[in-house]
């Protein structure tokens, strides 16, 4: 079906800028953008349907490029404990922290994990999200990592949403491998990753590179295996300390390196040269009350593409609003509203390996967009909370009004 969408203004986000078109029109067909530009320049078109968008501002569908949306259990009790002065180490000694999420995720059935993840993902969708990434990493063994990745595939099958599934088996050390990190990495490389990739459950491979998780040398072994399997890589890096994990990620042409509060100028240069996207996660920064800011000036100076994401997870960023992350990116990290919107559209698409098809409104790209009843694009980062009036279109078909 060919649809003409008109009476709107468009922030195309081409090249990471608003690249605004006022009094615009969009023609979609077969799920793609067939034409976009000033309405006055549109030649007569035979459309099956014409939609008046009422003067709305149209942006690409929002992309949440870093989530841990599939998990069992709830850690709000730990949140209360931390606010009462209990340290993370004390909580962990009591069996809390990520270990509690691993236990709950292992105990949950696939259907239970799907039901809870569906609710969280639908909350993100209400903010205009049309594409997101879902990581595993709370199973930490083959059966349970498979279970999590199967849920990610089910979310894509049952919701009007594009989902990229990332294997994060190297998220933490499972209890059965206590004190044997090298053995666990070998297990991932030799057994888990080949099996999961062979089942078509993995779009990318991620790891957590930190003193409390895995070393750069251990991560590199995983990256070598991912390369053998033809899988792109990503990395949690420089969140709590500087191990130059982001430079390691760049050496393997990673799609992204994420967090990055402690990255150096040298890391920024490496990422820029490799085209690796910097994914900033202000929700975790806020929730943990951190003070070390990502080096925004270095990222800008060297031309590193900057994305924003929710980091939705039960322990450090239980955030169900990507629009809130736009505001946090501006207020916490001093991003401009234009940079923030690029961070959840065009640069987020690149961070998922979808830059050729998603993230900006251009001819030939997927017709995912949101028509917002706002005065200007900056309003998306300005308003805190609430459900802004909007119409969400995925692959040329309206999914909400």
Swiss-Prot record:
Q: What is the similarity comment for this entry?
A: Belongs to the metallo-dependent hydrolases superfamily. HutI family.
Q: Which CDD domains match?
A: Imidazolone-5PH (cd01296)
- GO cellular component annotations of the record: cytoplasm
Q: Where does 4-imidazolone-5-propanoate bind?
A: 75, 138, 171, 239, 316
Protein residues bound to Fe(3+): 66, 68, 236, 311
Could you tell me the gene encoding this protein? hutI
Any idea which UniProt keywords this protein has? Cytoplasm, Histidine metabolism, Hydrolase, Iron, Metal-binding, Zinc
UniProt: Zn(2+) binding residues: 66, 68, 236, 311
Its job:
Catalyzes the hydrolytic cleavage of the carbon-nitrogen bond in imidazolone-5-propanoate to yield N-formimidoyl-L-glutamate. It is the third step in the universal histidine degradation pathway.
**Organism from which the protein derives:** Pseudomonas putida (strain ATCC 700007 / DSM 6899 / JCM 31910 / BCRC 17059 / LMG 24140 / F1)
User: Which residues are listed for N-formimidoyl-L-glutamate binding in this entry?
Assistant: 138, 313, 315
Q: What name appears for this protein in its UniProt entry?
A: Imidazolonepropionase
Cofactors: Zn(2+); Fe(3+)
Q: Which GO terms describe its biological process?
A: L-histidine catabolic process to glutamate and formamide; L-histidine catabolic process to glutamate and formate
């Amino acid at each position: 079906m060919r649809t003409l969408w008109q009476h709107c203004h468009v922030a195309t986000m081409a090249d990471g800028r608003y690249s605004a078109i006022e009094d615009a029109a969009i023609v979609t067909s077969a799920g793609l953008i067939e034409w976009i530009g000033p309405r006055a320049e549109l030649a007569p078109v035979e459309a099956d349907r014409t939609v008046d968008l009422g003067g709305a501002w149209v942006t690409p569908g929002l992309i949440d490029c870093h989530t841990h949306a599939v998990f069992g259990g709830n850690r709000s009790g730990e949140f209360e404990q931390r606010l009462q002065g209990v340290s993370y180490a004390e909580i962990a000694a009591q069996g809390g922290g990520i270990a509690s999420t691993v236990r709950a995720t292992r105990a949950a059935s696939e259907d239970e994990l799907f039901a809870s993840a569906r609710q969280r993902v639908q909350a993100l969708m209400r903010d205009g999200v049309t594409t997101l990434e879902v990581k595993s990493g709370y199973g930490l063994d083959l059966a349970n990592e498979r279970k999590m990745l199967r849920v990610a595939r089910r979310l894509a099958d049952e919701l009007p949403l594009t989902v990229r599934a990332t294997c994060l088996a190297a998220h933490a050390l499972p209890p059965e491998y206590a004190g044997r990190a090298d053995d666990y990495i070998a297990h991932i490389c030799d057994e888990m990753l080949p099996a999961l990739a062979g089942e078509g459950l993995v779009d990318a491979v991620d790891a957590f590179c930190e003193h409390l998780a895995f070393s750069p040398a251990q991560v590199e072994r995983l990256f070598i295996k991912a390369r053998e399997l033809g899988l792109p890589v990503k990395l949690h890096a420089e969140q709590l300390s500087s191990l130059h994990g982001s430079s390691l990620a760049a050496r393997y042409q990673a799609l992204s390196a994420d967090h990055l509060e402690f990255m150096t100028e040298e890391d920024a240069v490496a990422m820029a040269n490799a085209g690796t996207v910097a994914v900033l996660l202000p929700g975790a920064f806020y929730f943990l009350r951190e003070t070390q800011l990502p080096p925004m000036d270095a990222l800008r100076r060297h031309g590193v593409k900057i994305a924003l994401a929710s980091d939705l997870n039960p322990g450090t960023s239980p955030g169900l609003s990507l629009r809130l992350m736009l505001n946090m990116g501006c207020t916490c990290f001093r991003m401009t509203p234009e940079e923030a919107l690029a961070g959840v559209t065009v640069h987020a698409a690149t961070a998922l390996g979808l830059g050729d098809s998603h993230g900006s409104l251009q001819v030939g790209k997927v017709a995912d967009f949101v028509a917002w009843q706002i005065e200007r694009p900056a309003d998306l980062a300005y308003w805190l909370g609430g459900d802004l009036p909007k119409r969400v279109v995925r692959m040329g078909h309206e999914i909400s009004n």
